[in-house]
Protein backbone atom coordinates (compact mmCIF):
# COMPACT_ATOMS: atom_id res chain seq x y z
CA UNK A 1 0.00 0.00 0.00
CA UNK A 2 1.58 3.36 -1.03
CA UNK A 3 2.66 6.05 1.40
CA UNK A 4 1.74 9.71 0.95
CA UNK A 5 3.55 12.92 1.88
CA UNK A 6 2.11 12.99 5.42
CA UNK A 7 3.59 9.56 6.06
CA UNK A 8 0.16 7.97 6.33
CA UNK A 9 -1.26 5.31 4.10
CA UNK A 10 -4.52 5.76 2.17
CA UNK A 11 -7.52 4.27 3.96
CA UNK A 12 -10.53 2.86 2.18
CA UNK A 13 -13.90 3.21 3.86
CA UNK A 14 -15.82 5.37 6.27
CA UNK A 15 -14.56 7.43 9.17
CA UNK A 16 -15.90 5.82 12.32
CA UNK A 17 -15.67 9.07 14.27
CA UNK A 18 -17.89 10.98 11.86
CA UNK A 19 -20.16 8.39 10.24
CA UNK A 20 -23.15 7.14 12.14
CA UNK A 21 -25.08 5.52 9.29
CA UNK A 22 -24.64 1.76 8.93
CA UNK A 23 -22.35 0.85 6.06
CA UNK A 24 -20.81 -2.28 4.63
CA UNK A 25 -17.62 -0.27 4.08
CA UNK A 26 -15.04 -1.01 6.79
CA UNK A 27 -14.35 1.72 9.32
CA UNK A 28 -11.14 3.71 9.02
CA UNK A 29 -8.68 5.01 11.58
CA UNK A 30 -9.49 8.42 13.02
CA UNK A 31 -6.71 10.19 11.13
CA UNK A 32 -8.20 9.54 7.69
CA UNK A 33 -8.98 12.59 5.54
CA UNK A 34 -11.83 10.86 3.74
CA UNK A 35 -15.16 9.58 5.00
CA UNK A 36 -18.18 8.14 3.28
CA UNK A 37 -21.47 9.55 4.65
CA UNK A 38 -25.00 8.53 3.80
CA UNK A 39 -27.12 11.25 5.45
CA UNK A 40 -27.64 13.30 2.27
CA UNK A 41 -25.61 16.28 3.46
CA UNK A 42 -22.79 17.60 1.30
CA UNK A 43 -19.43 17.07 2.98
CA UNK A 44 -15.92 17.65 1.68
CA UNK A 45 -14.85 14.40 3.34
CA UNK A 46 -17.07 12.69 0.75
CA UNK A 47 -15.90 14.92 -2.05
CA UNK A 48 -12.62 14.61 -3.94
CA UNK A 49 -10.93 17.99 -4.21
CA UNK A 50 -7.17 17.46 -4.59
CA UNK A 51 -5.91 20.96 -3.85
CA UNK A 52 -2.18 21.56 -3.95
CA UNK A 53 0.31 23.71 -2.12
CA UNK A 54 2.17 26.44 -3.95
CA UNK A 55 4.93 24.70 -5.89
CA UNK A 56 8.49 25.96 -5.94
CA UNK A 57 8.81 28.61 -8.61
CA UNK A 58 5.06 29.31 -8.40
CA UNK A 59 3.95 31.39 -11.41
CA UNK A 60 0.47 32.35 -10.21
CA UNK A 61 1.68 35.87 -9.31
CA UNK A 62 4.12 36.27 -12.20
CA UNK A 63 5.04 39.91 -12.92
CA UNK A 64 2.43 41.06 -10.43
CA UNK A 65 -0.34 39.34 -12.43
CA UNK A 66 -2.56 36.60 -11.08
CA UNK A 67 -2.48 33.46 -13.22
CA UNK A 68 -6.02 32.10 -13.02
CA UNK A 69 -5.06 28.90 -14.83
CA UNK A 70 -2.40 28.02 -12.26
CA UNK A 71 -4.96 28.60 -9.51
CA UNK A 72 -7.47 26.30 -11.24
CA UNK A 73 -4.84 23.57 -11.16
CA UNK A 74 -3.86 24.19 -7.54
CA UNK A 75 -7.48 24.44 -6.39
CA UNK A 76 -8.18 20.99 -7.81
CA UNK A 77 -10.70 22.00 -10.48
CA UNK A 78 -8.77 20.48 -13.36
CA UNK A 79 -5.63 18.66 -14.44
CA UNK A 80 -3.68 18.85 -17.67
CA UNK A 81 -3.51 15.73 -19.83
CA UNK A 82 -1.48 17.11 -22.74
CA UNK A 83 -0.83 20.43 -24.42
CA UNK A 84 -4.20 22.16 -24.71
CA UNK A 85 -6.12 19.18 -23.26
CA UNK A 86 -7.55 19.17 -19.72
CA UNK A 87 -9.54 16.89 -17.42
CA UNK A 88 -12.27 18.44 -15.27
CA UNK A 89 -12.26 17.19 -11.67
CA UNK A 90 -15.34 17.22 -9.39
CA UNK A 91 -15.09 20.89 -8.35
CA UNK A 92 -14.52 21.99 -11.94
CA UNK A 93 -17.40 19.87 -13.15
CA UNK A 94 -19.72 21.50 -10.61
CA UNK A 95 -18.79 24.91 -12.04
CA UNK A 96 -19.32 23.69 -15.60
CA UNK A 97 -22.67 22.08 -14.71
CA UNK A 98 -23.91 25.34 -13.21
CA UNK A 99 -22.85 27.30 -16.29
CA UNK A 100 -24.71 24.79 -18.46
CA UNK A 101 -27.85 25.03 -16.32
CA UNK A 102 -27.75 28.82 -16.58
CA UNK A 103 -27.38 28.54 -20.36
CA UNK A 104 -30.28 26.06 -20.46
CA UNK A 105 -32.45 28.61 -18.67
CA UNK A 106 -31.82 31.31 -21.24
CA UNK A 107 -32.01 29.01 -24.24
CA UNK A 108 -35.39 27.80 -22.98
CA UNK A 109 -36.51 31.44 -22.83
CA UNK A 110 -35.88 31.57 -26.59
CA UNK A 111 -37.91 28.44 -27.26
CA UNK A 112 -34.81 26.46 -28.21
CA UNK A 113 -34.69 22.66 -28.07
CA UNK A 114 -31.55 20.94 -26.79
CA UNK A 115 -29.69 18.41 -28.94
CA UNK A 116 -26.39 16.55 -28.81
CA UNK A 117 -24.56 16.07 -32.09
CA UNK A 118 -21.76 13.60 -32.71
CA UNK A 119 -18.17 14.76 -32.34
CA UNK A 120 -17.39 13.00 -35.63
CA UNK A 121 -18.27 14.92 -38.78
CA UNK A 122 -18.00 13.78 -42.38
CA UNK A 123 -15.43 15.59 -44.50
CA UNK A 124 -17.89 15.39 -47.39
CA UNK A 125 -20.23 17.82 -45.63
CA UNK A 126 -17.41 20.27 -44.97
CA UNK A 127 -16.34 19.99 -48.59
CA UNK A 128 -19.91 20.71 -49.68
CA UNK A 129 -20.06 23.89 -47.59
CA UNK A 130 -16.67 25.03 -48.88
CA UNK A 131 -15.05 25.19 -45.45
CA UNK A 132 -12.69 22.24 -45.79
CA UNK A 133 -10.22 23.81 -48.21
CA UNK A 134 -7.40 25.86 -46.74
CA UNK A 135 -8.06 24.83 -43.13
CA UNK A 136 -6.34 21.44 -42.99
CA UNK A 137 -4.03 22.41 -40.16
CA UNK A 138 -6.94 23.30 -37.85
CA UNK A 139 -8.59 19.89 -37.92
CA UNK A 140 -8.09 16.61 -36.14
CA UNK A 141 -8.71 14.25 -39.06
CA UNK A 142 -9.17 10.49 -39.13
CA UNK A 143 -10.12 7.66 -41.46
CA UNK A 144 -12.11 4.52 -40.69
CA UNK A 145 -11.39 0.98 -41.91
CA UNK A 146 -13.52 1.62 -45.01
CA UNK A 147 -11.40 4.70 -45.80
CA UNK A 148 -14.25 7.09 -45.10
CA UNK A 149 -12.79 10.37 -43.88
CA UNK A 150 -13.97 12.23 -40.79
CA UNK A 151 -12.86 15.06 -38.58
CA UNK A 152 -13.40 15.91 -34.94
CA UNK A 153 -15.86 18.77 -35.21
CA UNK A 154 -14.68 22.25 -34.25
CA UNK A 155 -18.27 23.39 -34.95
CA UNK A 156 -21.46 21.87 -36.33
CA UNK A 157 -23.01 24.16 -38.95
CA UNK A 158 -22.74 21.53 -41.66
CA UNK A 159 -24.20 18.70 -39.62
CA UNK A 160 -27.13 20.65 -38.19
CA UNK A 161 -27.96 22.12 -41.60
CA UNK A 162 -28.12 18.63 -43.11
CA UNK A 163 -30.34 17.36 -40.30
CA UNK A 164 -32.78 20.22 -40.73
CA UNK A 165 -32.67 20.01 -44.55
CA UNK A 166 -33.74 16.36 -44.35
CA UNK A 167 -36.62 17.09 -41.98
CA UNK A 168 -37.98 20.58 -42.68
CA UNK A 169 -39.67 21.41 -45.99
CA UNK A 170 -42.30 24.07 -45.29
CA UNK A 171 -42.33 27.56 -43.82
CA UNK A 172 -44.92 26.18 -41.39
CA UNK A 173 -42.12 24.22 -39.70
CA UNK A 174 -40.21 27.43 -38.95
CA UNK A 175 -38.91 29.23 -36.97
CA UNK A 176 -36.70 26.53 -35.46
CA UNK A 177 -34.11 26.99 -32.73
CA UNK A 178 -31.78 24.15 -31.75
CA UNK A 179 -28.83 24.20 -29.37
CA UNK A 180 -26.26 21.87 -27.90
CA UNK A 181 -23.50 21.96 -25.29
CA UNK A 182 -20.76 19.61 -26.46
CA UNK A 183 -17.03 19.11 -26.78
CA UNK A 184 -15.31 20.68 -29.79
CA UNK A 185 -11.83 20.17 -31.20
CA UNK A 186 -9.32 22.42 -32.91
CA UNK A 187 -5.65 21.60 -33.50
CA UNK A 188 -4.28 24.87 -32.14
CA UNK A 189 -0.75 25.58 -33.31
CA UNK A 190 0.12 27.14 -29.94
CA UNK A 191 -2.26 26.25 -27.10
CA UNK A 192 -1.94 28.77 -24.29
CA UNK A 193 -3.57 30.25 -21.20
CA UNK A 194 -5.10 26.95 -20.17
CA UNK A 195 -8.81 26.74 -20.93
CA UNK A 196 -8.74 29.98 -22.91
CA UNK A 197 -6.92 28.52 -25.90
CA UNK A 198 -7.11 24.74 -25.85
CA UNK A 199 -7.36 21.97 -28.41
CA UNK A 200 -10.45 20.44 -26.80
CA UNK A 201 -13.14 22.68 -25.36
CA UNK A 202 -16.82 22.77 -24.40
CA UNK A 203 -19.09 25.08 -26.38
CA UNK A 204 -22.73 26.01 -26.43
CA UNK A 205 -23.97 26.40 -30.01
CA UNK A 206 -27.43 27.72 -30.86
CA UNK A 207 -28.57 27.35 -34.46
CA UNK A 208 -31.58 29.34 -35.67
CA UNK A 209 -33.64 28.83 -38.82
CA UNK A 210 -36.12 31.35 -40.27
CA UNK A 211 -38.03 31.64 -43.53
CA UNK A 212 -37.12 35.25 -44.35
CA UNK A 213 -34.22 37.60 -43.76
CA UNK A 214 -36.29 40.07 -41.65
CA UNK A 215 -37.48 37.21 -39.45
CA UNK A 216 -33.90 35.98 -39.04
CA UNK A 217 -32.79 39.44 -37.94
CA UNK A 218 -35.59 39.56 -35.37
CA UNK A 219 -34.37 36.21 -34.09
CA UNK A 220 -30.82 37.54 -33.98
CA UNK A 221 -31.90 40.45 -31.79
CA UNK A 222 -33.79 38.10 -29.46
CA UNK A 223 -30.65 35.97 -29.10
CA UNK A 224 -28.57 39.07 -28.35
CA UNK A 225 -30.97 39.99 -25.56
CA UNK A 226 -30.77 36.44 -24.16
CA UNK A 227 -26.96 36.71 -24.13
CA UNK A 228 -27.18 40.00 -22.26
CA UNK A 229 -29.54 38.38 -19.74
CA UNK A 230 -27.17 35.41 -19.32
CA UNK A 231 -24.18 37.67 -18.68
CA UNK A 232 -26.25 39.85 -16.34
CA UNK A 233 -27.02 36.75 -14.25
CA UNK A 234 -23.28 36.26 -13.78
CA UNK A 235 -23.07 39.79 -12.30
CA UNK A 236 -19.73 40.47 -13.90
CA UNK A 237 -18.79 43.48 -16.05
CA UNK A 238 -18.81 42.60 -19.74
CA UNK A 239 -18.36 44.23 -23.13
CA UNK A 240 -20.41 43.78 -26.30
CA UNK A 241 -18.72 44.75 -29.56
CA UNK A 242 -19.44 44.67 -33.27
CA UNK A 243 -17.21 41.99 -34.76
CA UNK A 244 -15.82 40.37 -37.88
CA UNK A 245 -17.64 37.19 -38.94
CA UNK A 246 -14.43 35.66 -40.31
CA UNK A 247 -14.68 32.09 -41.59
CA UNK A 248 -18.21 31.67 -40.22
CA UNK A 249 -19.69 33.83 -42.98
CA UNK A 250 -22.32 36.56 -42.83
CA UNK A 251 -21.97 40.28 -42.18
CA UNK A 252 -23.74 40.80 -38.85
CA UNK A 253 -22.04 39.58 -35.69
CA UNK A 254 -21.28 40.63 -32.12
CA UNK A 255 -18.71 39.47 -29.60
CA UNK A 256 -19.14 39.28 -25.84
CA UNK A 257 -16.07 39.87 -23.69
CA UNK A 258 -14.69 40.21 -20.20
CA UNK A 259 -12.14 43.01 -19.87
CA UNK A 260 -8.76 41.44 -19.06
CA UNK A 261 -5.17 42.62 -19.21
CA UNK A 262 -4.29 39.15 -20.50
CA UNK A 263 -6.99 39.14 -23.19
CA UNK A 264 -6.05 38.49 -26.80
CA UNK A 265 -8.64 40.88 -28.25
CA UNK A 266 -8.72 44.67 -28.20
CA UNK A 267 -12.11 46.35 -27.89
CA UNK A 268 -12.48 49.97 -28.96
CA UNK A 269 -15.22 51.87 -27.15
CA UNK A 270 -16.35 55.46 -26.80
CA UNK A 271 -16.46 57.28 -23.46
CA UNK A 272 -19.61 59.16 -24.51
CA UNK A 273 -21.78 57.05 -26.83
CA UNK A 274 -22.42 53.29 -27.10
CA UNK A 275 -19.93 52.78 -29.94
CA UNK A 276 -18.03 49.52 -29.39
CA UNK A 277 -16.14 47.43 -31.93
CA UNK A 278 -13.41 44.82 -32.08
CA UNK A 279 -10.15 46.34 -33.26
CA UNK A 280 -10.17 43.84 -36.15
CA UNK A 281 -13.23 45.63 -37.56
CA UNK A 282 -12.20 49.21 -36.84
CA UNK A 283 -11.54 51.54 -39.76
CA UNK A 284 -11.54 55.28 -39.04
CA UNK A 285 -12.86 57.82 -41.57
CA UNK A 286 -10.54 60.63 -42.58
CA UNK A 287 -12.69 63.33 -40.99
CA UNK A 288 -11.99 61.79 -37.56
CA UNK A 289 -8.24 61.68 -38.08
CA UNK A 290 -5.89 62.38 -35.15
CA UNK A 291 -3.23 64.90 -36.06
CA UNK A 292 0.14 63.36 -37.02
CA UNK A 293 3.49 64.97 -36.22
CA UNK A 294 4.93 67.23 -38.90
CA UNK A 295 7.03 65.23 -41.36
CA UNK A 296 10.63 66.10 -42.14
CA UNK A 297 11.27 67.93 -45.42
CA UNK A 298 12.63 65.48 -47.96
CA UNK A 299 12.72 65.42 -51.76
CA UNK A 300 11.27 61.92 -52.09
CA UNK A 301 9.52 60.75 -48.89
CA UNK A 302 9.04 61.80 -45.25
CA UNK A 303 11.68 60.24 -43.05
CA UNK A 304 9.18 59.68 -40.23
CA UNK A 305 6.78 57.79 -42.44
CA UNK A 306 5.98 54.18 -41.68
CA UNK A 307 5.81 51.57 -44.44
CA UNK A 308 4.05 48.23 -44.77
CA UNK A 309 4.97 45.80 -47.55
CA UNK A 310 2.66 43.08 -48.84
CA UNK A 311 2.22 40.79 -51.81
CA UNK A 312 -0.95 39.33 -53.30
CA UNK A 313 -1.70 35.64 -52.89
CA UNK A 314 -0.97 35.01 -56.58
CA UNK A 315 2.38 36.88 -56.18
CA UNK A 316 1.61 39.22 -59.12
CA UNK A 317 0.84 42.36 -57.15
CA UNK A 318 2.96 44.28 -54.67
CA UNK A 319 1.62 46.75 -52.12
CA UNK A 320 3.55 49.54 -50.45
CA UNK A 321 1.41 51.23 -47.81
CA UNK A 322 2.62 54.31 -46.00
CA UNK A 323 1.35 56.23 -42.99
CA UNK A 324 2.58 59.49 -41.47
CA UNK A 325 4.53 58.45 -38.38
CA UNK A 326 6.09 55.04 -37.76
CA UNK A 327 6.81 55.76 -34.09
CA UNK A 328 3.26 56.98 -33.39
CA UNK A 329 0.84 54.90 -35.45
CA UNK A 330 0.47 51.20 -36.23
CA UNK A 331 -0.95 49.94 -39.52
CA UNK A 332 -4.54 48.72 -39.51
CA UNK A 333 -4.44 45.41 -41.38
CA UNK A 334 -8.23 45.38 -41.68
CA UNK A 335 -8.16 48.66 -43.62
CA UNK A 336 -5.41 47.33 -45.89
CA UNK A 337 -7.43 44.15 -46.56
CA UNK A 338 -10.54 46.16 -47.45
CA UNK A 339 -8.61 48.24 -49.98
CA UNK A 340 -6.34 45.44 -51.22
CA UNK A 341 -8.37 42.21 -50.74
CA UNK A 342 -5.74 39.97 -52.37
CA UNK A 343 -3.21 40.64 -49.61
CA UNK A 344 -1.30 37.63 -48.26
CA UNK A 345 -1.17 38.29 -44.51
CA UNK A 346 1.31 35.47 -43.82
CA UNK A 347 4.21 37.83 -44.56
CA UNK A 348 5.76 40.19 -42.04
CA UNK A 349 4.80 43.63 -43.33
CA UNK A 350 8.10 45.11 -42.23
CA UNK A 351 10.21 42.52 -44.10
CA UNK A 352 10.77 44.36 -47.38
CA UNK A 353 13.22 41.82 -48.79
CA UNK A 354 11.01 38.76 -48.20
CA UNK A 355 7.99 40.44 -49.78
CA UNK A 356 9.98 41.73 -52.76
CA UNK A 357 11.58 38.33 -53.36
CA UNK A 358 8.18 36.61 -53.34
CA UNK A 359 6.77 39.17 -55.77
CA UNK A 360 9.60 39.55 -58.27
CA UNK A 361 10.75 35.91 -58.34
CA UNK A 362 7.32 34.78 -59.48
CA UNK A 363 7.73 36.78 -62.68
CA UNK A 364 10.37 34.38 -63.97
CA UNK A 365 8.23 31.37 -63.09
CA UNK A 366 5.06 32.40 -64.90
CA UNK A 367 6.35 35.10 -67.28
CA UNK A 368 3.48 37.42 -66.35
CA UNK A 369 4.02 41.19 -65.87
CA UNK A 370 4.00 42.55 -62.35
CA UNK A 371 2.06 45.44 -60.83
CA UNK A 372 3.03 47.43 -57.78
CA UNK A 373 0.70 49.71 -55.87
CA UNK A 374 1.43 52.62 -53.57
CA UNK A 375 -1.21 53.18 -50.89
CA UNK A 376 -0.78 56.44 -49.01
CA UNK A 377 -2.54 57.56 -45.84
CA UNK A 378 -4.24 60.88 -46.57
CA UNK A 379 -2.37 62.55 -43.70
CA UNK A 380 1.01 62.00 -45.32
CA UNK A 381 2.63 65.21 -46.49
CA UNK A 382 5.59 65.92 -48.72
CA UNK A 383 5.02 62.87 -50.91
CA UNK A 384 4.76 64.59 -54.31
CA UNK A 385 8.33 63.85 -55.27
CA UNK A 386 7.95 60.24 -54.28
CA UNK A 387 4.75 59.92 -56.33
CA UNK A 388 6.57 61.03 -59.47
CA UNK A 389 9.47 58.71 -58.78
CA UNK A 390 7.05 55.80 -58.18
CA UNK A 391 5.12 56.27 -61.41
CA UNK A 392 8.28 56.52 -63.48
CA UNK A 393 9.43 52.97 -62.69
CA UNK A 394 8.55 50.56 -65.54
CA UNK A 395 10.97 47.71 -64.81
CA UNK A 396 12.96 46.24 -61.95
CA UNK A 397 15.94 43.82 -61.80
CA UNK A 398 14.88 40.17 -61.49
CA UNK A 399 16.62 37.47 -59.43
CA UNK A 400 18.80 36.48 -62.39
CA UNK A 401 19.76 40.06 -63.26
CA UNK A 402 17.23 40.41 -66.07
CA UNK A 403 14.73 43.26 -66.20
CA UNK A 404 11.16 42.45 -65.13
CA UNK A 405 8.48 44.74 -66.62
CA UNK A 406 6.27 46.38 -63.99
CA UNK A 407 3.47 48.90 -63.91
CA UNK A 408 3.45 51.33 -60.99
CA UNK A 409 0.13 52.68 -59.75
CA UNK A 410 -1.18 54.67 -56.80
CA UNK A 411 -4.22 53.40 -54.86
CA UNK A 412 -6.55 55.87 -53.15
CA UNK A 413 -6.98 55.23 -49.42
CA UNK A 414 -10.74 54.90 -49.80
CA UNK A 415 -13.42 52.34 -49.00
CA UNK A 416 -16.73 52.67 -50.84
CA UNK A 417 -15.55 56.05 -52.12
CA UNK A 418 -14.92 57.45 -48.63
CA UNK A 419 -11.38 58.36 -47.47
CA UNK A 420 -10.18 56.28 -44.51
CA UNK A 421 -7.13 56.09 -42.28
CA UNK A 422 -4.64 53.27 -42.67
CA UNK A 423 -3.73 53.19 -38.98
CA UNK A 424 -5.11 51.64 -35.82
CA UNK A 425 -7.04 53.55 -33.21
CA UNK A 426 -5.30 54.92 -30.14
CA UNK A 427 -6.59 55.99 -26.74
CA UNK A 428 -8.24 59.43 -26.88
CA UNK A 429 -8.65 59.42 -30.66
CA UNK A 430 -11.95 61.03 -31.73
CA UNK A 431 -14.94 58.68 -31.88
CA UNK A 432 -16.06 57.97 -35.46
CA UNK A 433 -19.68 57.65 -34.30
CA UNK A 434 -20.33 60.80 -32.28
CA UNK A 435 -18.93 64.33 -32.19
CA UNK A 436 -17.91 64.58 -28.54
CA UNK A 437 -16.49 61.22 -27.52
CA UNK A 438 -12.96 59.92 -27.20
CA UNK A 439 -11.95 56.34 -27.86
CA UNK A 440 -10.76 53.97 -25.17
CA UNK A 441 -8.94 50.72 -25.95
CA UNK A 442 -9.34 47.71 -23.66
CA UNK A 443 -7.79 44.27 -23.79
CA UNK A 444 -10.48 41.64 -23.46
CA UNK A 445 -11.19 37.91 -23.49
CA UNK A 446 -13.96 36.73 -25.81
CA UNK A 447 -16.48 34.42 -24.15
CA UNK A 448 -19.33 34.44 -26.68
CA UNK A 449 -20.20 35.31 -30.27
CA UNK A 450 -23.45 35.75 -32.21
CA UNK A 451 -23.48 35.40 -36.00
CA UNK A 452 -26.24 36.15 -38.49
CA UNK A 453 -25.37 33.69 -41.26
CA UNK A 454 -28.12 34.37 -43.78
CA UNK A 455 -27.95 31.71 -46.50
CA UNK A 456 -24.20 31.06 -46.13
CA UNK A 457 -24.86 27.37 -45.31
CA UNK A 458 -28.44 26.80 -46.43
CA UNK A 459 -27.64 27.45 -50.09
CA UNK A 460 -24.69 25.03 -50.54
CA UNK A 461 -26.35 22.48 -48.23
CA UNK A 462 -29.68 22.84 -50.09
CA UNK A 463 -31.76 23.73 -47.04
CA UNK A 464 -34.92 25.11 -48.65
CA UNK A 465 -38.59 25.36 -47.73
CA UNK A 466 -41.79 26.24 -49.54
CA UNK A 467 -42.87 29.72 -48.45
CA UNK A 468 -46.43 31.08 -48.17
CA UNK A 469 -46.43 31.73 -51.93
CA UNK A 470 -45.49 28.12 -52.63
CA UNK A 471 -41.98 29.11 -53.77
CA UNK A 472 -38.74 27.42 -52.78
CA UNK A 473 -36.59 29.73 -50.64
CA UNK A 474 -33.28 29.18 -48.86
CA UNK A 475 -33.62 29.26 -45.09
CA UNK A 476 -31.97 32.18 -43.27
CA UNK A 477 -29.77 30.95 -40.44
CA UNK A 478 -27.92 32.14 -37.38
CA UNK A 479 -25.20 30.57 -35.22
CA UNK A 480 -24.56 31.72 -31.67
CA UNK A 481 -21.83 30.38 -29.40
CA UNK A 482 -20.76 30.58 -25.76
CA UNK A 483 -17.44 29.10 -24.69
CA UNK A 484 -18.39 27.09 -21.60
CA UNK A 485 -14.93 25.86 -20.64
CA UNK A 486 -13.52 29.19 -21.81
CA UNK A 487 -15.84 30.95 -19.34
CA UNK A 488 -14.32 28.94 -16.50
CA UNK A 489 -10.81 30.07 -17.45
CA UNK A 490 -11.87 33.67 -18.10
CA UNK A 491 -13.72 34.07 -14.80
CA UNK A 492 -10.87 32.41 -12.90
CA UNK A 493 -8.50 35.05 -14.27
CA UNK A 494 -10.99 37.90 -13.83
CA UNK A 495 -11.79 37.31 -10.15
CA UNK A 496 -8.61 35.70 -8.80
CA UNK A 497 -6.49 37.48 -6.22
CA UNK A 498 -3.38 36.59 -4.27
CA UNK A 499 -5.40 34.33 -1.95
CA UNK A 500 -7.03 32.24 -4.64
CA UNK A 501 -9.97 31.99 -7.01
CA UNK A 502 -13.28 33.80 -6.84
CA UNK A 503 -16.64 32.80 -8.29
CA UNK A 504 -19.97 34.47 -8.97
CA UNK A 505 -22.77 33.02 -6.86
CA UNK A 506 -24.47 31.64 -9.97
CA UNK A 507 -21.65 29.24 -10.87
CA UNK A 508 -19.59 28.74 -7.70
CA UNK A 509 -18.79 25.06 -7.00
CA UNK A 510 -20.50 25.66 -3.64
CA UNK A 511 -21.98 29.00 -2.61
CA UNK A 512 -20.97 28.55 1.02
CA UNK A 513 -18.66 26.30 2.99
CA UNK A 514 -19.29 25.60 6.66
CA UNK A 515 -16.08 25.11 8.66
CA UNK A 516 -16.54 23.99 12.29
CA UNK A 517 -13.77 23.61 14.82
CA UNK A 518 -13.32 20.02 16.08
CA UNK A 519 -14.91 20.85 19.43
CA UNK A 520 -18.27 21.87 17.94
CA UNK A 521 -20.99 19.30 18.52
CA UNK A 522 -21.82 17.38 15.35
CA UNK A 523 -25.56 17.91 15.84
CA UNK A 524 -25.05 21.70 15.92
CA UNK A 525 -23.04 21.56 12.69
CA UNK A 526 -25.69 19.51 10.94
CA UNK A 527 -28.50 21.74 12.22
CA UNK A 528 -26.77 24.87 10.92
CA UNK A 529 -26.05 23.16 7.60
CA UNK A 530 -29.72 22.25 7.26
CA UNK A 531 -30.74 25.83 8.03
CA UNK A 532 -28.51 27.25 5.30
CA UNK A 533 -29.15 24.47 2.79
CA UNK A 534 -32.93 24.69 3.21
CA UNK A 535 -32.72 28.37 2.24
CA UNK A 536 -31.59 27.23 -1.24
CA UNK A 537 -27.96 28.14 -0.59
CA UNK A 538 -25.66 25.49 -2.09
CA UNK A 539 -23.60 24.57 0.97
CA UNK A 540 -21.01 22.01 1.97
CA UNK A 541 -19.39 21.10 5.29
CA UNK A 542 -15.62 20.93 5.55
CA UNK A 543 -15.42 18.03 8.00
CA UNK A 544 -12.01 16.81 6.88
CA UNK A 545 -9.60 16.13 9.71
CA UNK A 546 -7.30 19.02 8.98
CA UNK A 547 -6.15 22.04 10.96
CA UNK A 548 -8.50 25.05 10.91
CA UNK A 549 -5.83 27.24 9.30
CA UNK A 550 -5.40 24.73 6.49
CA UNK A 551 -9.17 24.59 5.90
CA UNK A 552 -9.52 28.38 5.80
CA UNK A 553 -6.64 28.69 3.34
CA UNK A 554 -8.14 25.91 1.25
CA UNK A 555 -11.50 27.71 1.17
CA UNK A 556 -9.78 30.88 -0.05
CA UNK A 557 -7.91 28.94 -2.72
CA UNK A 558 -11.09 27.32 -4.09
CA UNK A 559 -12.95 30.63 -3.95
CA UNK A 560 -16.26 29.85 -2.25
CA UNK A 561 -18.27 33.10 -2.13
CA UNK A 562 -19.05 32.65 1.59
CA UNK A 563 -17.16 30.95 4.40
CA UNK A 564 -19.09 30.28 7.61
CA UNK A 565 -16.83 29.53 10.60
CA UNK A 566 -18.17 27.82 13.71
CA UNK A 567 -15.51 28.59 16.28
CA UNK A 568 -15.03 30.21 19.66
CA UNK A 569 -17.98 32.60 19.24
CA UNK A 570 -20.29 29.63 18.77
CA UNK A 571 -19.30 28.11 22.08
CA UNK A 572 -19.69 31.47 23.86
CA UNK A 573 -22.89 32.89 22.30
CA UNK A 574 -24.01 30.74 19.36
CA UNK A 575 -22.52 33.25 16.92
CA UNK A 576 -20.67 32.62 13.66
CA UNK A 577 -17.92 34.30 11.70
CA UNK A 578 -19.10 35.07 8.17
CA UNK A 579 -16.41 35.74 5.57
CA UNK A 580 -16.80 37.09 2.03
CA UNK A 581 -13.41 37.73 0.44
CA UNK A 582 -14.70 39.46 -2.70
CA UNK A 583 -16.48 42.05 -0.53
CA UNK A 584 -13.64 42.18 2.02
CA UNK A 585 -16.05 41.24 4.81
CA UNK A 586 -15.31 39.27 7.95
CA UNK A 587 -17.99 39.74 10.59
CA UNK A 588 -19.77 38.07 13.47
CA UNK A 589 -23.42 37.15 12.96
CA UNK A 590 -25.97 35.26 15.00
CA UNK A 591 -26.93 31.83 13.72
CA UNK A 592 -30.52 32.96 13.23
CA UNK A 593 -29.35 35.79 10.94
CA UNK A 594 -26.80 33.99 8.80
CA UNK A 595 -29.20 33.11 5.96
CA UNK A 596 -30.59 36.63 5.63
CA UNK A 597 -27.09 38.12 5.79
CA UNK A 598 -25.79 35.80 3.05
CA UNK A 599 -28.83 36.68 0.93
CA UNK A 600 -28.19 40.39 1.48
CA UNK A 601 -24.49 40.23 0.64
CA UNK A 602 -25.01 37.96 -2.36
CA UNK A 603 -26.85 40.80 -4.11
CA UNK A 604 -23.52 42.65 -4.24
CA UNK A 605 -21.60 39.76 -5.79
What are these regions (language model features)?
Residues 2-605:
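NTP/phosphate- and nucleic-acid-binding module
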Amino acid sequence: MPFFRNGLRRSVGACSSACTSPSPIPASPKWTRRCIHFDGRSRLSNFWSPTQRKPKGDRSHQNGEIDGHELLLRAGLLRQSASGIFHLLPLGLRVQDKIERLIDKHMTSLGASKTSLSSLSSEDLWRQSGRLDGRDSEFFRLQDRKEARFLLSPTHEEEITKIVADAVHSYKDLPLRLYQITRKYRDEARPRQGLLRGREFVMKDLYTFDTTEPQARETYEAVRQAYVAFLTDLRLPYLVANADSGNMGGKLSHEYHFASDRGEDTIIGCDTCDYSVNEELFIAPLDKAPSPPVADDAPSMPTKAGFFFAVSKDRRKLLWATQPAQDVFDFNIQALKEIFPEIDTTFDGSDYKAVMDAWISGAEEDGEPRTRYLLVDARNEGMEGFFEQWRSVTSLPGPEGNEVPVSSEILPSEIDGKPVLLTKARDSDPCPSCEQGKLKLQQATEIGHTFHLGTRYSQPMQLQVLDANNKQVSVSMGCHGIGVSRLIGAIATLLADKEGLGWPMAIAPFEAVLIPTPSIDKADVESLYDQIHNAAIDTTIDDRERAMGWKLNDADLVGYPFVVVMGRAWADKKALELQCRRLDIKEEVQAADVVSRIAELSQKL
